[in-house]
């Protein structure tokens, strides 16, 4: 009995553990590859992203992931209220089920998301849908002890008596899961107390099995049936007694006592409330029953007395007795009567026992035969099952070993692939990190260079601005100087015109002087003629004196005019000399400033040239280092691509392309730097060449001016020589005239002095002009030196031009090379882009193939795992079932064997007792036979004695009194005459057989129960 009870308890514990495993996992076990974009957005609670996905594709409203979960399931499981309202507004399916046939309402209740559950209930969700385990939303609310959710579900017409596959209502489920608050809540909401599960266990039995005394008190307060039995025939009190739960036993006993007291009170109240008429009727009925029983007893006694009288008459006829022995016989008769009564009672009991034993023998024989057949079949089935189990165990072990080997192999492959994948990912990440670092370094270097270029350009701009300001100032000064030079040229031209006019005047005067000299010669010739002729001398003298006076006046006027002209010439020469000195000073300043500027500019250009050379060297070094780094990265990429089983030719092409790209990039950088530097230097060279051209132009103009001045000086020299010659000639003529004319000698002396003075003045002017010419020669020498320095500058400029041409040629070569490189770079870029596209396409294809293979492999693995798990589960279940059956059979067999041994011992004890009883019975039979013979003899005597007595019986006889006092039913007296044999050996054997059958039946009763 205890084994059965312990089996029931273990079954309850197993059900509780399975229930905990079933209900413990809340929410979903989510993997990212199982989800779509809308499912990820729903899990995150991103309602905007969900709405965006739905606007793009309205079909995604009820779309499922790879585990058959909708967006509403995931949103309810994670408590995303906004997403749930959005989906319900879009009219999604509210009662849609997942793979376990669970609705979104079940998931919201299971995950204790009350807000989502309330929204679903308000929108009309069905709370009575069952999952694959038969559980409703109320079961999940009970498991989570959600009283508020349970109230909401009950207010929306949830079934409080819904049964799951185990036959548990929410109340029974709450007791199984030890949820006392939910039990109280369900009892308040009028849950059925008398509900039964698949094992016919009530709520009280479950509470006793789980040792929940508080729930037992609640159920007893609700007047639950105590005597209800489960499928094993056990009550709650039996389970409490078996499990030694004394507190629960006391509670049940107290409840029983209360129930009995209440029942007695109710009976008393009923009897008190009954009318007296009913009591009278009951009394009459009782009296009638007693009268009938008394009449039957009297009739039976009369019949017995008549039979006994007949027997006594016969005995009296056979053996007459004396009246003296009447007292003894009377005592013997009373003793015999008592013995007969005992014997009759014993015989009736024996008869009933025999009938029962026969009936039971037949039943037991049939049952034993059936049991033997069942045992034989059971043994055969056990043997067959053992053989089948051994075979299946061997097969399953082989299959398990094969599956384990396959799993190990697949796991090793998976681990290898994962390891390779991780290694490749690590390599790719390292390459990406290296590339990122290289790119960052490259970007930093470019930023530095850009900053340097910006600073350099800013410096250039500032320099250009300063140069522009200086050049603007110089241009302004040049404009002023050019204006001044222009004005000086205009004045010089005016002076030239005046000089020409004076030259013309001098020529006219010289012509006039020549004419005067001719006139003087003619006059002298005439005077000579006159002297020769001496006619009219005085008149002619007066005429000659008048003519001389007029000629002297003319000469004076001419001298005055010459003086004025000479003064004007001197003034003009002074002004021209001053202007020339100013112009020369300005030119010297300009030339000196230009030379200084050119020297400074040349120094700056040389410094910049050296700086650019140093930068080019640095860039070449950096380029070499980058090329080394890029080649290392290329080698790593080549190794990486080789690992992905790419062909060698595109890899070599990509490496060559990368090398060409690097070279083109470096050449681009160099060209860019060289282009930036020569552009700036070109501007500087242009400015220098413009300055040089201006200097050359100014030098040419100065040379032209010097030539013109030299020509003018030579002209002046020629004019002076002409004037000196003319004056000498004129003086000679004057002297000759005065030599001839003694009268006018003084005047001629005066004139000669004046002419000498004029000649001295002219000589002084000549010396001044010669000094000026010397100064001009010195200036010319200075200008020649300057021209020589300018020649050197020109040589330097020519060198610079040559360098510039060389640089331009280099730039052109670089441009051509750059164009070629650009063309090659374009081709390389196209080829690279094609290769990149091909590589990307190949990588994408490989990734897609890898992902597809991985997905297929994962699907296959999942299917294999599912199949393996399913097969293993099936095999385990079959093994468990077989083991359970086998264990049950073993336990039953062991129990049967132990009980059989016990029953054998009891049977041996019973046989001993039976043998002792049979011996006692034989002894009692012998005694009875002796007594019966004595009684028979005494009956015959009494009959004979009574036959001699009158027929009416004496009421004072004790035998008659005893017969009247004994109430014997007719049915217990046998109709046939009872024969008492002296010896009956079959009775003991029959008793033995009946006892053995009883013992066997009592021993095999639990086996029948188990079967």
From Swiss-Prot:
Residues 280-293 have a biased composition (Basic residues). It holds the Pfam family DUF3496. The gene is ANKRD18B. InterPro entries: Ankyrin_repeat_domain (IPR050657), Ankyrin_rpt (IPR002110), Ankyrin_rpt-contain_sf (IPR036770), CC144C-like_CC_dom (IPR039497), DUF3496 (IPR021885). Residues 264-330, 533-554 are annotated as: Disordered. This is Ankyrin repeat domain-containing protein 18B. SMART domains: ANK. Residues 294-319 have a biased composition (Basic and acidic residues). Residues 277-319, 385-639, 692-722, 752-908 form a coiled coil. ANK repeats lie at residues 67-96, 100-129, 133-162, 166-195, 199-228. It comes from the Eukaryota. The lineage of its organism: Eukaryota, Metazoa, Chordata, Craniata, Vertebrata. Keywords: ANK repeat, Coiled coil, Repeat. SUPFAM superfamilies: Ankyrin repeat (SSF48403).
């Amino acid at each position: 009995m205890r084994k059965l009870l312990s089996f029931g308890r273990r079954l309850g514990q197993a059900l509780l553990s399975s229930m905990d495993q079933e209900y413990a996992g809340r929410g979903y076990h989510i993997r990212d590859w199982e989800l779509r974009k809308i499912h990820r957005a729903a899990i995150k609670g991103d309602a905007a992203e969900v709405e965006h996905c739905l606007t793009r594709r309205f079909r995604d409203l009820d779309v499922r992931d790879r585990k058959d979960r909708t967006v509403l399931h995931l949103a309810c499981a994670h408590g995303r209220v906004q997403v749930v309202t959005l989906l319900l507004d879009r009219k999604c399916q509210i009662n849609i089920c997942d793979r376990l046939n669970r609705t979104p309402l079940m998931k919201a209740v299971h995950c204790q998301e009350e807000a989502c559950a309330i929204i679903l209930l308000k929108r009309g969700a069905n709370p009575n849908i069952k999952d694959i385990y038969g559980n409703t939303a109320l079961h999940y609310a009970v498991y989570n002890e959600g009283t508020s959710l349970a109230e909401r579900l009950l207010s929306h017409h949830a079934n409080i008596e819904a049964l799951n596959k185990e036959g548990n209502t929410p109340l029974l489920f709450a007791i199984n899961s030890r949820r006392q608050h939910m039990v109280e809540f369900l009892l308040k909401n009028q849950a059925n107390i008398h509900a039964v599960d698949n094992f016919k266990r009530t709520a009280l039995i479950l509470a006793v099995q789980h040792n929940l005394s508080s729930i037992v008190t609640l159920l007893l307060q609700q007047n639950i049936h105590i005597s209800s039995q489960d499928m094993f025939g056990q009550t709650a009190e039996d389970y409490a007694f078996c499990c030694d739960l004394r507190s629960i036993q006391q509670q049940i006993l107290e409840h029983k006592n209360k129930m009995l007291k209440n029942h007695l009170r109710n009976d008393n109240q009923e009897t008190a409330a009954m009318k007296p008429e009913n009591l009278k009727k009951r009394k009459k009925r009782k009296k009638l029953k007693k009268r009938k029983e008394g009449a039957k007893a009297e009739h039976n006694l009369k019949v017995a007395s008549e039979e006994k009288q007949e027997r006594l008459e016969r005995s009296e006829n056979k053996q007459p007795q004396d009246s003296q022995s009447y007292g003894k016989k009377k005592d013997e008769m009373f003793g015999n009567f008592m013995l007969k009564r005992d014997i009759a009672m014993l015989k009736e009991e024996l008869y009933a026992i025999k009938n029962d034993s026969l009936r039971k023998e037949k039943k037991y024989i049939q049952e034993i035969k059936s049991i033997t057949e069942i045992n034989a079949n059971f043994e055969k089935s056990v043997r067959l099952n053992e053989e089948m189990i051994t075979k299946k165990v061997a097969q399953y072990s082989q299959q398990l070993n094969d599956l384990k080997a396959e799993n190990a192999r697949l796991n090793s492959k998976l681990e290898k692939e994962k390891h390779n994948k991780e290694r490749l990912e690590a390599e790719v990440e390292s390459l990406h990190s290296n590339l990122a670092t290289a790119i960052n370094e490259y970007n930093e270097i470019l930023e530095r260079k850009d900053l340097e270029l910006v600073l350099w350009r800013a410096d250039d701009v500032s320099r250009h601005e300063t140069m522009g300001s200086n050049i603007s100032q110089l241009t302004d000064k040049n404009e002023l100087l050019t204006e001044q030079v222009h004005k000086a040229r205009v004045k010089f031209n005016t002076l030239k015109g005046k000089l020409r006019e004076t030259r013309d005047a001098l020529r006219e005067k010289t012509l006039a002087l020549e004419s005067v000299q001719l006139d003087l010669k003619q006059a002298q010739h005439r005077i000579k003629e006159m002297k020769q002729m001496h006619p009219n001398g005085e008149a002619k003298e007066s005429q000659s004196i008048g003519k001389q006076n007029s000629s002297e006046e003319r000469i004076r006027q001419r001298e005055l005019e010459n003086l004025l002209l000479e003064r004007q010439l001197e003034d003009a020469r002074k002004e021209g000399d001053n202007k020339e000195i100013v112009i020369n000073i300005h030119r010297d300043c300009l030339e000196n400033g230009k030379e200084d500027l050119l020297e400074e500019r040349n120094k700056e250009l040389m410094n910049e040239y050296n700086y650019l050379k140093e930068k080019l060297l640095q860039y070449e070094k950096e380029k070499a280092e980058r090329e080394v780094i890029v080649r290392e990265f290329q080698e790593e990429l080549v190794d990486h691509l080789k690992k992905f089983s790419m062909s060698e030719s595109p890899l070599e092409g990509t490496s060559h392309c990368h090398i060409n790209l690097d070279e083109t990039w470096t050449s681009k950088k160099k060209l860019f730097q060289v282009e930036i530097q020569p552009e700036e230097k070109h501007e500087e060279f242009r400015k220098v060449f413009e300055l040089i051209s201006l200097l050359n132009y100014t030098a040419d103009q100065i040379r032209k001016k010097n030539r013109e001045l030299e020509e003018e000086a030579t002209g002046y020299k020629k004019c002076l020589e002409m004037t000196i010659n003319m004056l000498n000639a004129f003086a000679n003529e004057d002297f000759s005239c005065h030599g001839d004319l003694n009268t006018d000698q003084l005047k001629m002396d005066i004139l000669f002095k004046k002419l000498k003075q004029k000649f001295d003045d002219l000589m002084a002017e000549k010396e001044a002009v010669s000094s000026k010419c010397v100064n001009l020669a010195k200036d010319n020498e200075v200008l020649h030196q300057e021209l020589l320095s300018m020649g050197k500058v020109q040589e330097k400029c020519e060198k610079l031009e040559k360098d510039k041409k060389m640089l331009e040629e280099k730039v052109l070569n670089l441009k051509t090379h750059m164009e070629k490189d650009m063309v090659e770079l374009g081709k390389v870029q196209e080829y690279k882009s094609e290769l990149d596209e091909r590589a990307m396409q190949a990588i994408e294809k490989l990734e897609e193939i890898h992902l597809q293979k991985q997905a297929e492999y994962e699907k296959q693995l999942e299917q294999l795992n599912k199949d393996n798990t399913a097969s293993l589960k099936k095999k385990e279940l079959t093994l468990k079932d077989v083991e359970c059956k086998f264990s049950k059979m073993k336990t039953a067999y062991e129990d049967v064997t132990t009980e059989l041994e016990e029953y054998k011992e009891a049977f041996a004890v019973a046989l001993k007792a039976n043998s002792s009883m049979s011996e006692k019975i034989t002894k009692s039979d012998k005694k009875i036979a002796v007594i019966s013979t004595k009684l028979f003899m005494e009956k015959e005597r009494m009959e004979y004695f009574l036959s001699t007595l009158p027929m009416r019986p004496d009421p004072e006889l004790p035998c008659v009194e005893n017969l009247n006092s004994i109430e014997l039913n007719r049915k217990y007296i046998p109709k046939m005459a009872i024969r008492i044999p002296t010896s009956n050996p079959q009775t003991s054997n029959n008793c033995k057989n009946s006892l053995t059958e009883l013992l066997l039946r009592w021993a095999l009763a639990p086996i029948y129960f188990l079967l």
